[in-house]
Curated annotation (Swiss-Prot):
Protein name per the record: Holliday junction branch migration complex subunit RuvB
Notes concerning its domains: Has 3 domains, the large (RuvB-L) and small ATPase (RuvB-S) domains and the C-terminal head (RuvB-H) domain. The head domain binds DNA, while the ATPase domains jointly bind ATP, ADP or are empty depending on the state of the subunit in the translocation cycle. During a single DNA translocation step the structure of each domain remains the same, but their relative positions change.
EC number from the UniProt entry: 3.6.4.-
GO BP, one annotated term: DNA repair
Native organism taxonomy: Bacteria, Bacillati, Bacillota, Bacilli, Bacillales
Sections of the chain in a coiled coil: none
Keyword Hydrolase included in the entry's annotation: yes
Cellular component, GO annotation: cytoplasm; Holliday junction resolvase complex
Amino acid sequence: MDERIISSETVDAEEVSFETSLRPQTLSQYIGQDKVKNNLTVFIEAATLRNEALDHVLLYGPPGLGKTTLAMVIASEMGSQIKTTSGPAIERPGDLATILTSLEPGDVLFIDEIHRLSRAIEEILYPAMEDYCLDIVIGTGPTARSVRLDLPPFTLIGATTRAGLLSAPLRDRFGVIDHLEFYTEEQLTEIVLRTSNILDTKIDDLGAREIARRSRGTPRIANRLLKRVRDFAQVRGNGTVTEKLAKEALTLLQVDPRGLDTIDQKLLHTIIQSFRGGPVGLDTIAASIGEERETIEDMQEPYLLQIGFLQRTPRGRIATETAYNHLGISYEKEV
């Protein structure tokens, strides 16, 4: 496949628009992440009672789990406007200064991929986050002088798939740090049913569960698979997504019962057949299957680790007995 249907990254502008149309507006509508939601409910209510901006929030976890959606829900619950940007989009200190000085009291600033901010940009954020002020330098050379501008109280929400790449000074300035976890099959089934209702697509409970089962614990993938299975239901079925039709469609889309596609299987086969199950270094795996190291770390490893198909050790990656069994390969434990 040219495009991984089970990729947890957004593919194009059309998919971004599709996701936006599905987003809940309140925490009560947001499915899953119950611990995170319960804590945020308390923090938001407390900030509202004190008439203060919510403390800065860092959301981290694999792609597609709802970090952007949750940021927008937080802003909605606070009755605030949200301005969105991303780490790579803020190239110069002036870019960030322009955004910060445009904020109104109580606004939410959402920075996706916040781990990709440069250190120079981070240093501007420190006083903005701590003291709601902005230090800028006017002029150059001997006549240069520093001017401090006051900023209105605001909430910064940062999202990242790689929290370990954030500098300690930046990470320490977030008052709320939440990790988003993979979703359960039951939660994803509920999401699929909700999305099908919004799309006016007929689906039965078993059909929804079959899609959920193969969605890698990720709502973005569940919604994408539903769209594709819906196509099969309309063209090759009677318009209703049943368990039988979902299985047939997902098999044709090369998504197996555990949500693995050909690239996942190639990775596991490489570890097992070329390196006797491991341990083998990530760079070696990447070179062997023709993928970038970062792609494997962000897109494939988290789920394979979650379902117990892969182990990460100081010496490298190891395919587990569960992975052998799933691929139908005989497992011989070394003595």
